[in-house]
């Protein structure tokens, strides 16, 4: 239905969607709630320095990164996606909602020139062997499916975030609940500790030493 009417509500705001983007889901709003808590807990010494940087990787419609910017204006937000078609929609949503964001075409963090304080990532995590609801057939396969039991891109961004995040920075990922233990174990071996898990969201903190 969202593709027919051309928009979907997320965190109280309407976002344009097309077949180049995933449809925003209520479950993803938990990531915003967790982010707000993390920013609130950020030591004052960091808040006094240049703006905290956030990158929304695999941004799609931009719903996560744009919402983060509107809820937390102090953040410097970049919307990144490998798909230029998705980025065109993210740009439109950002402009329409008056969110001051930067748009970047990038394969995960490859083209991002900074260390981020926060990374949000709702990457493809569906394995093609899973039974999936019929409505997913209309959503872009590039944004849905991944190899390695659905964890290929999630593992890749954990590896990249080991240098792409500031020490003590946070990586927030969305995945199926059945995958969260495997993600946590993989992250532990790559310099991260799990600090929170809520529904489909897992929060990983880069070790400071």
Language model feature labels by segment:
Residues 41-42, 206-209:
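Generic C-terminal helix-cap and adjacent flexible tail
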Residues 149-206:
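Conserved Class I SAM-dependent methyltransferase catalytic core
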């Amino acid at each position: 239905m969202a593709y027919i009417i051309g928009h979907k509500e997320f965190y109280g705001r309407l976002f344009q969607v097309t077949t180049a983007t995933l449809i925003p889901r209520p479950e993803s709003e938990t990531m915003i709630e967790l982010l707000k808590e993390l920013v609130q807990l950020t030591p004052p010494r960091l808040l006094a320095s240049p703006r905290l940087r956030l990158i929304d990787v695999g941004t799609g419609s931009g719903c996560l990164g744009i919402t983060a910017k509107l809820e937390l204006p102090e953040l410097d937000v970049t919307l990144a996606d490998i798909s230029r078609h998705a980025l065109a929609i993210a740009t439109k949503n950002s402009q329409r909602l008056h969110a001051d964001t930067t748009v970047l075409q990038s394969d995960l963090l490859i083209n991002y020139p900074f260390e981020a304080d926060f990374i949000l990532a709702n990457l493809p995590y569906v394995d093609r062997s899973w039974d999936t609801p019929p409505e997913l057939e209309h959503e872009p396969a590039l944004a849905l499916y991944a190899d390695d039991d659905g964890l290929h891109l999630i593992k890749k961004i954990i590896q990249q975030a080991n240098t792409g995040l500031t020490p003590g920075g946070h990586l927030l990922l969305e995945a199926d609940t059945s995958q969260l233990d495997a993600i946590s174990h993989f992250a532990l071996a790559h310099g991260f500790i799990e600090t929170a898990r809520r529904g489909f969201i897992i929060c990983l903190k880069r070790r400071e030493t």
